[in-house]
């Protein structure tokens, strides 16, 4: 069951709280949505990001880009719609030395689903497609590792045995709203990163008390628009998992009063769990946290571009970056 505000009791930022450490020289790593879904956007954005680094904040980097192709049996979280050929996606990530994460967060997988040919082909390709570089995702051989975001232990055990070159991320679709659940997940050596439910984002009293080795594993979901008091988040994710398995299901009907308006970044910023740039620089980085996930796989590329501008781009260069992207005539932003 999803937690409520009273259950989580988050400490509000700025209420007598002092940063324990300086954020100087600390880097925020963003994990961006739409590996397949927004291939065209990243094909236009990444040359600007690498070629004009002065346009962007010096304290941030791209940690990974995550997503799934359309009709992936192992998919979950959001219904994937990415149609770009996997070899093109792998080549783009390799060119820019960025970790690719396959979103395989279906929570309802059974043994018979593990032989799915499409998902196995993706694993075979991306396990071997890492680039060389100096990113935080390097393995001991100087190669940028690719990852798997998952919920199912059954799937994790299968991938570990058949495709041992991946690292694993514990998906936010587990809906870890109890802090004890988060601590138990952080203890698991299988996971390099753990994405807690966004309602733990401001549980600063408990978060700051974590050992440094666990802080390094926490990956915060920054821009969730779901109601803070939602009690049906798990059911919503299970609905997506069933659809990915090919079950004929009606869409989950969100009971939130704001559900009819769809995702709006301006509304997400009002969410009690929202993490903005000031929070990252003044609260999270100084206290030892460096991993931040941006949601948006099911949105339009124009909205995702706004995330890239807000979280990564200096205000005085946002118009210039926007123009660079818009002038790419091959990109359909809507």
Protein language model features and the residues they cover:
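Intrinsically disordered, low-complexity polyampholyte segments enriched for Lys and acidic residues
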Residues: 5-9, 15
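Active-site pocket-lining/capping segments in soluble small-molecule metabolic enzymes
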Residues: 14-181, 185, 191-334
């Amino acid at each position: 069951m999803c937690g409520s505000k009273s259950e989580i009791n988050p400490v509000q930022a700025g209420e007598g709280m002092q940063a324990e450490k300086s954020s100087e020289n600390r880097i925020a790593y963003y994990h961006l949505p739409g590996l397949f879904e927004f291939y065209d956007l990243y094909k236009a954005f990444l040359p600007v990001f690498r070629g004009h680094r002065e346009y962007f904040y010096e304290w941030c980097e791209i940690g990974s880009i995550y997503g799934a192709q359309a009709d992936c049996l192992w998919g979950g979280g959001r219904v994937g719609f990415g149609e770009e050929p996997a070899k093109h996606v792998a080549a783009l990530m390799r060119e820019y030395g960025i970790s690719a994460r396959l979103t395989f967060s279906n929570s309802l997988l059974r043994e018979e689903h593990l032989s799915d040919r499409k998902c196995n082909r993706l694993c075979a390709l991306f396990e071997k497609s890492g680039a060389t570089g100096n990113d935080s995702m390097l393995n001991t051989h100087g190669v940028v590792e690719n990852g798997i975001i998952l919920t199912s232990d059954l799937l994790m055990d299968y991938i570990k045995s058949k495709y041992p070159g991946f690292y694993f991320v514990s998906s936010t679709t587990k809906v870890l709203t109890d802090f004890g659940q988060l601590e138990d997940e952080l203890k698991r050596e299988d996971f390099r990163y753990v994405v807690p439910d966004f309602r733990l984002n401001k549980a600063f009293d408990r978060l700051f008390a974590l050992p440094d080795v666990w802080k390094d594993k926490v990956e915060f979901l920054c821009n969730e628009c779901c109601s803070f008091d939602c009690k049906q988040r798990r059911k919503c994710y299970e609905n997506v998992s069933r659809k990915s398995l090919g079950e004929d299901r009606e869409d989950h009907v969100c009971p939130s009063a704001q559900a009819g308006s769809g995702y709006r970044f301006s509304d997400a910023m009002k969410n009690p769990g929202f993490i903005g740039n000031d929070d990252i620089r003044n609260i999270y980085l100084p206290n030892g946290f460096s991993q931040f996930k941006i949601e948006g796989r099911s949105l339009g590329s124009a909205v995702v571009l706004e995330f890239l501008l807000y979280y990564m781009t200096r205000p005085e260069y946002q118009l210039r970056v926007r123009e660079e992207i818009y002038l790419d005539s091959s990109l359909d932003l809507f």
